[in-house]
Design a protein with these regions (language model features):
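A hydrophobic/aromatic-rich effector-binding and dimerization subdomain
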Residues: 1-10, 52-119, 136-151
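Short, conserved beta-strand element in jelly-roll/cupin
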Residues: 16-33
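A generic fold-level signal
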Residues: 18, 34, 42, 64-66, ...
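A short, compositionally biased micro-patch
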Residues: 26-28, 51, 175
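Short acidic-glycine-tyrosine-enriched beta hairpin
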Residues: 37-52
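Short, Lys/Arg-enriched, Trp-marked, Pro/Gly-tolerant hinge/linker segments that flank
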Residues: 94-102, 117-128, 137-174, 178, ...
């Protein structure tokens, strides 16, 4: 996590890109962005996925109401089957139109993260990071949910043998009446 902030942009921005992932979540209002030269009108609950190198800019036209946006900068991560520091949407587009349930979850999470930045308590960074991980998992579930379910879920590598043993026991408890093989 590089940064998180809530902003009400009042002027148009300049074309720019980042060498890290920047997520821009629209809390309210409409946000007009030019991304790689193409215009996108983002609504509340939409997420701009600014992968490294993506050229984008915010534009505010005369008479338009300013949106409220939350910016989150991330680095030093790598999702399986994606380039480092990137979150690739299936259609290759830079904007994710969140479903109603995800929108509700993200609204709550980003508000909680913003509140956490203001309270200045010990462990603040780790709390925000934990919320960010939750946000990323929810995004991945919407983006790749159906496809990954067919592949038995996402791959989360763990070096903790205790975690693996607990998962095996939980699986056996849930499926004790079924035929269980090592292939499962």
């Amino acid at each position: 996590l590089l940064y998180i902030g809530k902003k009400v942009p009042e002027v148009s921005g300049e074309d720019h890109s980042h060498d890290y992932l920047e997520l821009t979540y629209i809390l309210s209002g409409q946000a007009r962005y030019y991304i790689e030269g193409k215009e996108y009108l983002l609504q509340p609950g939409d997420l701009l996925v600014g992968n490294p190198g993506l050229v984008h800019r915010f534009e505010l036209r005369e008479g338009e109401k300013t949106p409220i946006e939350v910016y989150i900068g991330l680095s030093n991560f790598h999702f399986q089957d994606m380039p480092p520091q990137s979150l690739i949407l299936p259609d290759g587009a830079p904007v994710l139109r969140c479903k109603a349930e995800l929108k509700q979850d993200l609204n709550q999470l980003v508000q909680t993260m913003i509140s956490e930045t203001k309270i200045q308590q010990s462990g603040q960074y780790f709390m925000i990071k934990a919320y960010m991980v939750q946000m990323l998992v929810l995004l991945l579930r919407q983006i790749y949910g159906e496809e990954k379910q067919e592949n038995h879920g996402f791959v989360f590598e763990s070096r903790s043998k205790g975690y693996v043993v607990k998962r095996i026991i939980a699986y056996m408890n849930e499926n004790y009446a079924s035929h269980i093989s090592l292939d499962q």
